Amino acid sequence: MGSKRKKAEKQKDFVKAKLRVGKTAAKPDNHTDTSFIAKSISIPNQTINKKTSNTEKKYEVDLAHHLSLTKHHSDVTRKEVLNYIEQHLPSNPSLYKDILTSIVPLIIDQSQNVRNALTSLLSACATQQVGLLDLHIRSIILFIHSAMSHIKPDIRNSSTKFLSVLIDHATESLVRSYFIKTLKSYFTLLSWTLTNDKKAVSLAITTSSSIGGPSKKARIHHLSILRAFLSAALFPISSNERKLDYSKIKMIHPESYKYLLASSTQPFASLKLFVQEVPKQKNTDIQQNTKKDDNAFSLNDLDTVSTEDIDTRRKVMLDVFMAPMLRNLKNLIKEGGEVGREAHSCMKVLEQLQSETK
């Protein structure tokens, strides 16, 4: 009896179970259940990573949504979005890169209300984050120069408002890197000529009549900003306005300041180490403006001249821009009124430069 029972028990291991419809197959005896879920233990006081709060995440999402609306087809929506961003500027400096990347193209927006709101927003951003416009001046000045030569008269008339913001908040970066290009854009904006030949004068008159010259009110504002730009570029900063005076700092060596970090952004941009420029053809009409002095700059030299120091800016002004600017300012003074008054103030700046460089 015992042997039969043992044989029956051993035989059970080799018997194949019959499957029934609607019922799952029987699990083997050595089956291990792996359906459990491990629970994590969180200790907030001992965590290393600092998580952002829900309010910060919500604000970043809200800011990204409003920045996307800067490309809305309605000018009213674009203006309201700019006003909203100005009233809710973030305290996190890393968010300002996305803000400026989205709003700078609106410098050439078709709506005047949008451009006015953008001027206020740029000033607010520069006040909130000191040095912000210096970091993004390359893209900002690109759109400003484009606005100064735009085909739309309204965009040209409001272009110097943005230049005024740069003069107030990014003076050194503006005059050091973009002095020549800004003056050239000013000549285009005011329909002035750099040369006195008949071909250039007739071309300027034709261009001004076809695209429409600046209005009287706009010319007053343009000349006012031009005076501020020339004063900032051609005269040294006073000791009260200077951010850091190295002469009053005690150092190990009197020339230690030369080896410190530069106070300006991109101090070696003038060397053009990583820039490939296309060679330009010489223009015979421009060569007529070249002076007999070998050390004097000509219009052909302006593309390769670096205006990092004030002496170079003064020399460029005296050699190239002084004579045509005085000639055009005298014509504006003859008109009288507020335009003549602003032109006279610009001429005073140039006369002061001439008296100091004699």
From Swiss-Prot:
It comes from the Eukaryota. It is found in: Nucleus. One of its GO terms (biological process) is maturation of LSU-rRNA from tricistronic rRNA transcript (SSU-rRNA, 5.8S rRNA, LSU-rRNA). Disulfide bonds: none annotated. Keywords: Nucleus, Ribosome biogenesis, rRNA processing. GO terms for cellular component: cytosol; nucleoplasm; rixosome complex. Pfam families: Ipi1_N. Its main location: nucleus. The keyword Nucleus applies. The keyword Ubl conjugation does not apply. One of its GO terms (molecular function) is chromatin binding. Gene3D superfamilies: Leucine-rich Repeat Variant (1.25.10.10). Belongs to the IPI1/TEX10 family. PANTHER family: REGULATOR OF MICROTUBULE DYNAMICS PROTEIN (PTHR16056), TESTIS-EXPRESSED PROTEIN 10 (PTHR16056:SF2). Component of the RIX1 complex, composed of IPI1, RIX1/IPI2 and IPI3 in a 1:2:2 stoichiometry. The complex interacts (via RIX1) with MDN1 (via its hexameric AAA ATPase ring) and the pre-60S ribosome particles. Component of the RIX1 complex required for processing of ITS2 sequences from 35S pre-rRNA. This is Pre-rRNA-processing protein IPI1. It comes from Debaryomyces hansenii (strain ATCC 36239 / CBS 767 / BCRC 21394 / JCM 1990 / NBRC 0083 / IGC 2968) (Yeast).
